[in-house]
Curated annotation (Swiss-Prot):
Name of the molecule in the record: Ribonuclease P protein component
Superkingdom in the source lineage: Bacteria
Species, as recorded: Chlorobium phaeobacteroides (strain DSM 266 / SMG 266 / 2430)
Enzyme Commission identifier(s): 3.1.26.5
Top EC class, one word: hydrolase
Length: 146
């Protein structure tokens, strides 16, 4: 149950092992990954294929808010919290892309970086972030399935 793609118990949770932390994967994501951009967020993503059944989860994500864009730590932390919650509510879209139940998709892993690129004056509401993450994840699904 530790690294299952979608166990019924944790469908809408963001587990610790789903957070992208490996420096090598993060560096590769920014160097060779694709990106899509919205009004407030920019997503970098990269699909990797492993021939051996890996213990890492199908989708790993990281969230970042630049100190340059949002100088106050309290605001940065709030934005990251909102981004994590919006992703958590919409992440089920991505698991259809990396569904381990389909043999042609087994061994597929997706790394995603969600960056806040909005302004520092006014911050988007949770609902706006949720809609934008949903739209950007839909774009990822379309580009990766073709």
């Amino acid at each position: 149950m530790h690294h299952e793609v979608m166990s019924g118990l944790h469908v809408n949770s963001l587990r610790k092992h789903e957070i992208l932390r490996k420096e090598q994967l993060i560096a590769a994501l920014f160097v060779s990954g694709k990106s899509c951009k919205g009004e407030y967020l920019k997503l970098f993503y990269q699909k990797t294929v492993s021939d051996v059944k890996s213990r890492s989860p199908a989708v790993q994500v990281l969230f970042a808010v630049s100190k340059k864009n949002v100088p106050h730590a309290v605001s940065r932390n709030r934005l990251k919290r909102l981004m994590r919650e919006a992703y958590r509510n919409e992440k089920q879209q991505l698991f259809t892309l990396c569904d381990e139940g389909r043999p042609e998709m087994s061994g597929i892993h997706l790394q995603i970086a969600v960056l806040y690129i909005g302004g520092r004056k006014s911050f988007p509401s949770f609902e706006l972030l949720r809609q934008e993450i949903s739209r950007l994840m839909h774009n990822i699904r379309l580009s990766e399935l073709t």
